[in-house]
């Protein structure tokens, strides 16, 4: 599904988010290869994850962005793990964020 970038709800403006080395790598990958994975929002269009991708779309002036709409927390976590796995395939090791598994 596609959604207007302006319809994605976040607590703060993505233009104000910090851009660190990790975000720069993800932005460069999107610029070279396109956006491979959509962002995930809930049914109220609130961003669940994919902030670096949303930030790239905002900076690039995209009008629309591919989204997955999901309200199930378990499915959101599964999607996040899947999408993170893809990012890990191209990010340098020192930029990979490790999460403690419960």
Regions found by a protein language model. Give the residues of each.
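Short, charged/polar connector segments at secondary-structure boundaries
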Residues: 1-71, 75-91
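Alpha-helical interaction elements
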Residues: 87-102
